[in-house]
Amino acid sequence: MAMPRVLCRVRLLIHNDFSVISKYSPVVNSVLINKCARFRHSIRHFRTNFPAGLVLNTSQKQDASSSSSDSDSSDSDEDDVTIEYHRGLPQITVPLPSRKERCRFTLKPISNTVGDFLEMLKKEDRGIDRVVCKTIDGTRIASSTTIETLLQDDFKLLINDNAYNVDSPKQERLTTEEVQGLSDVKTLVNQLYEALNVREHQLQKEVELTTQLETLQQELLPLEEKKLELEQVANRRSNWMAWAGLGLMSVQFGILARLTWWEYSWDIMEPVTYFVTYGTAMAAYAYFVLTREEYILNDVRDRQQLLLLHKKAKKTGFDVNQYNVLKDQIAKLELDLKRLRDPLKLRLPPKAAAKEEKKQVEEKAKE
């Protein structure tokens, strides 16, 4: 019975019900009341401080858990194999097992292969005994596979006893329609550039080539006159030699006829005519051996005329080499002008192209 009374008094002291205490207790001891008041104060202090400490411990636990989760995530990131594209080239970052550090490898998608990548890993870290690339389902990837083919799908990288799941970044590729549209835009830009600039460029080029052609023709004009004179002299000389050959053949015919029908008989002159004919064949063969050309009368005449022309040119001081160089340059310029004035390059309609071609024919006729 005493214990419940004490508890009731303590409860009343906490709630400041001193009047009730005096009702139940005939004699109130001041010392007991003071002790109860101290007990009440300590209880009140305990009640106010306990939640604050609890909240502090809870916040510390949350901070610790968050920091641990961040460190775990950073550690997991450092232990993964990542792929990034830098200036169009894939860069693979791999954690090295011996050095406990990450190393970045820059690869060429077309020229490098899986074997090259594995050799790079072994060369960078001598502690790597076994390194293999496999697909997600465990199929080994051949060393001859290109990096471009490897990065088309996700794969696994096995380094010693560690296995890494590698996520290949998806590359954006142009569709057929986009490529065709880009080609159409490129063609349109080229046509606009040609319409605005090419015609003017062609006119400037035509003026430049025409000026050069006129200059070379002026330089060639005195040489042409000199060459014409030499050709006339050589032509007369070659004609004279041709008539001289005909005269010699006539004399030969007359001598053989005289000996056959007047001086001797045919029985005597037949072997003579045979040797004369055979000697003529030997002379033709000797001509082939010396000139490396067949004995054809037109070719013989032209060759003789050319020899006479060079002989006369040396005597008169005519520079044949300069003449040939000027003729080659003029022929080249004329060819360039012909190509420049081609109706297909000018992109003219059919009627305009016909007019342009007629104009070129008239210019050639005037020349």
Swiss-Prot record:
The chain crosses the membrane at residues 233-253, 263-284. GO terms for biological process: calcium import into the mitochondrion; mitochondrial calcium ion homeostasis. Ca(2+) binds at residue 270. A motif (Selectivity filter) lies at residues 266-276. Residues 61-80 are annotated as: Disordered. Residues 1-12 form a transit peptide. MCU channel activity is regulated by the heterodimer composed of MICU1 and MICU2, which act as calcium-sensors. At low calcium levels, MICU1 occludes the pore of the MCU channel, preventing mitochondrial calcium uptake. At higher calcium levels, calcium-binding to MICU1 and MICU2 induces a conformational change that weakens MCU-MICU1 interactions and moves the MICU1-MICU2 heterodimer away from the pore, allowing calcium permeation through the channel. Residues 254-262 are mitochondrial intermembrane. It catalyses: Ca(2+)(in) = Ca(2+)(out). GO terms for molecular function: calcium channel activity; metal ion binding; uniporter activity. It is a multi-pass membrane protein. It is found in: Mitochondrion inner membrane. Residues 199-233 form a coiled coil. Belongs to the MCU (TC 1.A.77) family. The selectivity filter, in which calcium ions are arranged in single file, is composed of two acidic rings separated by one helical turn along the central axis of the channel pore. Channel-forming and calcium-conducting subunit of the mitochondrial inner membrane calcium uniporter complex (uniplex), which mediates calcium uptake into the mitochondrial matrix. MCU channel activity is regulated by the calcium-sensor subunits of the uniplex MICU1 and MICU2. Mitochondrial calcium homeostasis plays key roles in cellular physiology and regulates ATP production, cytoplasmic calcium signals and activation of cell death pathways. This is Calcium uniporter protein, mitochondrial. The lineage of its organism: Eukaryota, Metazoa, Ecdysozoa, Arthropoda, Hexapoda.
